[in-house]
Regions:
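Conserved glycine-rich beta-strand-loop-beta hairpin in the small C-terminal domain of fold type I
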Residues: 166-167, 186-233, 245
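Extracellular glycoprotein-like low-complexity segments
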Residues: 179-183
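Conserved PLP-enzyme active-site core in the AAT-like
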Residues: 1-178, 208, 212-219, 223, ...
Length: 246
């Protein structure tokens, strides 16, 4: 999982009116857990918009203006958007049915666009009406409302339980007397180079929730602990063959 806020900051430093469309098809659940939430498009957009309005950021921006504008220097420096020019314009698509409770094809478009009313609203609604049905499936729409309600009431508990089950699955595979001879679950340190992990924490969740919080706050890339990646190189078959015949 990348640092959504950082990506947008550095892109807006180059093109201050850039519009972002984030595909969060498998990430709708993230809004409902405090560790995941800052790396969602909508939360990152709100945080960035608030940040750009503060006098402290203005001072920070002016102090960070590069003295050396050579390509090499710019590539090695974290870029910051100009608060006087940058506009936060962010859209995110969620396939709600994939990780929340909704009927198949139930999905949402989320919008945080400072220029929506002025530049986008009319065209957006026209495009939506042009591509949607005049006979919508109200069962799907109702399931979206139910899924949203369930997530609002029970979301944290469900996500936390999901993390616990994922860790139990990792432990079961890694400590199984037979399975562990041929496969193991890849850790953060094995999948993300050290230079992208400022926290230096090799296995964030396994060493405690507080370490997961630290890693997700500091690292440029993090591993979603609810996703289990199993290395099967010692089985003698590749992933495609294993998937097809397993």
């Amino acid at each position: 999982v990348y640092d959504v806020g950082r990506v947008m900051e550095e892109c807006l430093a180059i093109k201050p009116d850039l519009v972002f469309l984030w595909d969060e098809a498998w990430f709708p659940f993230a809004r409902f857990h405090h560790v995941y939430r800052p790396r969602t498009a909508m939360e990152a957009a709100r945080t960035l918009a608030d940040k750009l309005r503060t006098p402290a950021y203005r001072e920070q921006y002016e102090a960070s203006l590069p003295r050396d504008e050579s390509t090499e220097a710019l590539l090695n420096q974290r870029l910051s958007p100009d608060p006087a020019r940058a506009r936060v314009r962010v859209y995110a698509t969620h396939s709600t049915h994939k990780t929340l409770t909704a009927l198949r094809q139930g999905s949402m478009i989320h919008v945080y666009d400072q220029d929506f009313a002025l530049k986008v609203a009319e065209g957006f609604h026209e495009a939506y009406m042009a591509h949607t049905s005049t006979s919508p499936n109200y069962q799907i729409l109702a399931s979206l409302d139910l899924g949203r309600r369930q997530a609002a009431l029970e979301g944290f508990e469900l996500v936390q339980r999901q993390l616990e089950y994922a860790m139990k699955l990792r432990d079961a595979i890694d400590h199984h007397p037979l399975l562990s001879k041929y496969m193991h679950c890849l850790s953060t340190a094995e999948m993300i180079p050290e230079k992208y992990r400022a926290s230096g924490i090799a296995q964030p969740l396994r060493t405690g929730l507080s370490n997961m919080v630290t890693a997700w706050e500091q690292d440029e890339f993090v591993l979603d602990p609810s996703r289990v990646t199993v290395y099967i190189g010692l089985t003698g078959v590749d992933g495609a063959t294993f998937s097809a015949n397993g």
